[in-house]
Amino acid sequence: MVSQFLMIFTLISIWISLIWGVVILVSAVHFWLKHSDFKVDKEELPYYPKVTIVVPAHNEDVVISQTAKAILNMNYPHDKVELLLFADNCSDNTYQECLAVQALPEYAGRNITIINRKGTGGKAGVLNDALKMADGEYICIYDADAMPETNALYFLVKEVMKDPERRVASFGRNKTRNAKQNFLTRCINQEIVVTQRVHHVGMWHLFKIGRIPGTNFIIQTEFVKSIGGWRNGALTEDTDISFKIMQSGKLIALAYNSEAFQQEPETLKSYYMQRKRWAKGNYEVVISNFKHLFGKGNWRVKLEVANYSCIFF
């Protein structure tokens, strides 16, 4: 009897997953057919809000200079950009590399602050420290190994400006910076392409559900303060705050033209450790939000809890 029940349950879950996958795929295909011209529409925005860009860097002296330069060279009014570079508990030359970028003559007069941080809380702790310092209406996050494309910030801002009251955040797409390094990075690149160009696009196009990634996104500064900031020590602070946004009834908009190039693991060991951390962090988020699946609340939260539950249980 038990074995028959488990077999039926397994078959039903497989069919539900297949149908769900087809629905999301159709939604993504419809979206890309509507946006198949790939034109980069760069009209002037009616308003350019000030943005505080935060870069948490822990022992990233190899890549931090390139990333900082890419951020400072973005196509966004320079007087509307504040850059906070955090050398977070570093034992290498990350802090010195940040100072070297700040000293370059082409960035003279730019609003750059470099913090040699010795605090706790991991990435979430860095973001909470940045929240106390930020002067911008929006906070933008880039990991130290994520180089934004020239118009990345412009497209993120453009998307939230379509409805600033509801769209408290927007996120772009990430590409693999070292995709051709070896077989593993090629596989990771294909995974990212499917996840971001199919799943994320399909979810936004059909349900207006967005998910904040770890990098290449902006969020309203005052909104983050209103929910108490990021949860210190959270392994997946991006997923955690995404659920808080949905619980408030606000939206995380997809800026499909905003792109950043991110370094991915090149060895199986580093890949395993990264995915283990993500799985543990997402598992914690699902457990803490599982109650929303059955009670009264936002339907988007229920849908996301159900989706994450199927993945991590």
Placement of each model-derived feature along the sequence:
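Cell-envelope/extracellular polymer assembly enzymes that use nucleotide-activated donors
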Residues: P49-T52, E82, K225, D240
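Acidic helix N-cap motif at the loop->helix transition within catalytic regions
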Residues: S65, D92-V101, N151
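N-terminal membrane-anchoring/stem segments of glycan-assembly enzymes
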Residues: M1-Y47
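Short, acidic, metal-binding catalytic loop of nucleotide-sugar glycosyltransferases
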Residues: K69-K80
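Long helical/loop segments within the catalytic core of UDP-sugar-dependent glycosyltransferases
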Residues: Q102, E106-G109, I115-N116, G122-K132, ...
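A conserved acidic beta->alpha catalytic loop
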Residues: H78, A87-Q96, G119-T120
